[in-house]
């Protein structure tokens, strides 16, 4: 196949704007799958992807299409739409020459779409606006065209209107891909360079790398070098990606997309964004933009049954084979026993991983409140980074603390603007920009501490705007914050898993809310249980769970009052002793109550 007849493109869309359905339609139109074999959402392979309607891993498919009596190869490179996976998006888009910008005709441009379009523009991609779901009764094509032009600045006079559901406009769309998106620029004589834009683990073949060949070529049995690790491997097999079963090939030429089998044991050896080159004709430098995926959100995961600790370790090891962005290290908690402090790309990533651990490995887990990385500047000049509030040094050793900030982009119907600004101010947000896209819709940009977003910001945003607002964020920098550690004591014992880091001005109110929420949850004991919130040695809030009364004088019929007094005194003594050594078992809800306070 001549390079001039290859088109590499991806689809950019917000969740629920019909990206996976559109991909399925394009695959079907190109005849790669018969209608009988077509399962809805061919490109989404994980159960969670299909259930939640999101794409987590980047998938690819090679399609053949005949146009003007010429055969063309279309490589559709699917990208995750969600903010947590934006690094995978950037690598997928770097493998393309063009992108379809898909916008729902009834909903208009959303926040995540903007973030991904900017990545595409940075990579100089040819962008084709596609307005989907034109079959819906409330579709407003002209309004959506205006939004795309106003927010993103892309000319929409040639936008393609399609319905992925009914198939309207799909043929015209494929022909536009061929005529508008340029063929790959290649240099067959240059040393081989291949960009890994996805990798996953196969039980039979080991870690597989999905690559786009930029220059040169790779053939079976070649000795190749992974540039960030400097490790050499032999190419055992090469495939073209196909939705049903991959197609074997002897070599991959420049401009092509394919799967490289190197017989590796973990995906950590072929990380997304890395470059593969030949040992015998080594490239001088790697393709730019490689970053190791960084965890932003951390949480403790503990098995409810303490003897399942090793099972949890095995499960995390297996997930790590397929997702090198997870980080984890063992930690112990006085309240919860042995578990792991796990790092995630973001909140959705955390939910998906926890769900996969419970579903695929049959584990029952307690997750502590999510936290972020803090930079602690100590009085002796040392800088330490912590992810767990219980690691915070004593107050007298801290000079100042820096916390991570993100740039939050929100698009909302204007009727909810007042509520949203109140929420963002409460979350310590700083307004950067406010722009009316149309009289009914507003674009907001705010700098917000990441810690305020990881708790429950997304849920609150959705409930305040009846689900109509969309939200996206990207990390910007660390800034100094006036922060303190809030500890919770139950029956005099510090419950380390409930410690949180909060802004000083909110500590008092958060402490009060937490102890009153805990009071409802902690079961009554035979002795009084004090629930206290403290900063250092200072108690700032307290609630008491009353004891259950036991009538010790029930068997004492009539008779001497001193006898009754003696029994009551004895009970008092017993309760005192019990209180000193009593253990209170906290239910799972107690650890979740931290998430619910505002």
UniProtKB/Swiss-Prot annotation:
GO terms for molecular function: GTP binding; GTPase activity; ribosome binding; translation elongation factor activity. GTP binds at residues 16-21, 132-135. This is Elongation factor 4. Residues 4-185 form the tr-type G domain. It comes from Campylobacter jejuni subsp. jejuni serotype O:2 (strain ATCC 700819 / NCTC 11168). It is a peripheral membrane protein. Keywords: Cell inner membrane, Cell membrane, GTP-binding, Hydrolase, Membrane, Nucleotide-binding, Protein biosynthesis. InterPro entries: EF-4, EFG_III/V, EFG_V-like, EFTu-like_2, G_TR_CS, LepA_C_sf, LepA_CTD, LepA_IV. It is found in: Cell inner membrane. GO terms for biological process: positive regulation of translation. The keyword Nucleotide-binding applies. GO terms for cellular component: plasma membrane. It catalyses: GTP + H2O = GDP + phosphate + H(+). Its EC number is 3.6.5.n1. Required for accurate and efficient protein synthesis under certain stress conditions. May act as a fidelity factor of the translation reaction, by catalyzing a one-codon backward translocation of tRNAs on improperly translocated ribosomes. Back-translocation proceeds from a post-translocation (POST) complex to a pre-translocation (PRE) complex, thus giving elongation factor G a second chance to translocate the tRNAs correctly. Binds to ribosomes in a GTP-dependent manner. Belongs to the TRAFAC class translation factor GTPase superfamily. Classic translation factor GTPase family. LepA subfamily. Its main location: membrane. The gene is lepA. The keyword Cell membrane applies. Pfam families: EFG_C (PF00679), GTP_EFTU (PF00009), GTP_EFTU_D2 (PF03144), LepA_C (PF06421).
């Amino acid at each position: 196949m001549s390079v001039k007849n290859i088109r590499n493109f991806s689809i950019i869309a917000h969740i629920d704007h019909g990206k996976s359905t559109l991909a399925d339609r394009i695959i079907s139109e190109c005849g790669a799958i018969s209608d009988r074999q077509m399962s809805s959402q061919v490109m989404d392979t994980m159960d969670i992807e299909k259930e939640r309607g999101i794409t987590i891993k980047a998938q690819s498919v090679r399609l053949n299409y005949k146009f003007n009596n010429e055969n063309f190869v279309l490589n559709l490179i699917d990208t995750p739409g969600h903010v947590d996976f934006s690094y995978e998006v950037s690598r997928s888009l770097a493998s393309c020459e063009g992108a379809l910008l898909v916008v729902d005709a009834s909903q208009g441009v959303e926040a995540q779409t903007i973030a991904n379009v900017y990545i595409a523009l940075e990579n100089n991609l040819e962008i084709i606006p596609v307005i989907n779901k034109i079959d819906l009764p409330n579709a407003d094509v002209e309004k959506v065209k205006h939004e795309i032009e106003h927010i993103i600045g892309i000319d929409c006079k040639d936008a393609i209107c399609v319905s992925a559901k009914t198939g309207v406009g799909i043929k015209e769309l494929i022909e536009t891909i061929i005529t508008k998106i340029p063929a790959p620029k290649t240099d067959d004589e240059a040393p081989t360079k291949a960009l890994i834009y996805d990798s996953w683990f196969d039980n039979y073949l080991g870690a597989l790398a999905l690559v786009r060949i930029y220059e040169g070529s790779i053939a079976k049995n070649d000795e190749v070098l992974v540039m960030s690790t400097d490790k050499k491997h032999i190419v055992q097999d090469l495939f073209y990606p196909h939705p049903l079963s991959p197609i074997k090939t002897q070599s991959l030429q420049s401009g092509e997309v394919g799967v490289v089998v190197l017989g590796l044991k973990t995906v950590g050896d072929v990380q997304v964004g890395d470059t593969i080159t030949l040992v015998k004709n080594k490239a001088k430098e790697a393709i730019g933009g490689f970053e190791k995926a960084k965890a932003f959100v951390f949480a403790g995961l503990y098995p409810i049954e303490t003897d399942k600790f090793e099972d949890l370790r095995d499960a995390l090891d297996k997930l790590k084979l397929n997702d090198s962005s997870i980080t984890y290290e063992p930690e112990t908690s006085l309240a919860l026993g042995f578990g792991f402090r796990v790092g995630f790309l973001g909140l959705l990533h955390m939910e998906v991983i926890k769900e996969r651990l419970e579903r695929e490995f049959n584990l029952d887990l307690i997750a502590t409140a999510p936290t972020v990385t803090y930079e602690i500047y100590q009085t002796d000049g040392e800088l330490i980074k912590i992810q767990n509030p219980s690691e915070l040094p004593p107050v007298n050793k801290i000079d100042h603390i820096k916390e991570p900030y993100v740039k939050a982009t929100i698009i909302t119907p204007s009727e909810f603007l007042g509520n949203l600004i109140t929420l963002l101010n409460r979350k310590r947000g700083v307004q950067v920009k406010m722009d009316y896209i149309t009289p009914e819709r507003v674009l907001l940009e705010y700098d917000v501490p990441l810690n305020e977003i990881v708790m429950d910001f997304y849920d609150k945003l959705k409930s305040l705007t009846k689900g109509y607002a969309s939200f996206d964020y990207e990390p910007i920098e660390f800034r100094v914050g006036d922060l303190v550690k809030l500890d919770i004591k139950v029956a005099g014992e510090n419950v380390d898993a409930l410690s949180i880091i909060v802004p000083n001005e909110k500590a008092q109110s958060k402490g009060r809310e937490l102890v009153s929420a805990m009071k409802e949850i902690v079961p009554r004991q035979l002795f009084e249980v004090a629930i206290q919130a403290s900063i250092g040695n200072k108690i700032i809030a307290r609630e008491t769970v009353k004891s259950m009364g036991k009538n010790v004088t029930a068997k004492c019929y009539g008779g001497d009052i001193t006898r009754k007094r003696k029994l009551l005194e004895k009970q008092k003594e017993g309760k005192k002793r019990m209180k000193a050594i009593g253990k209170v078992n906290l239910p799972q809800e107690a650890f979740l109550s931290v998430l619910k306070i505002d």
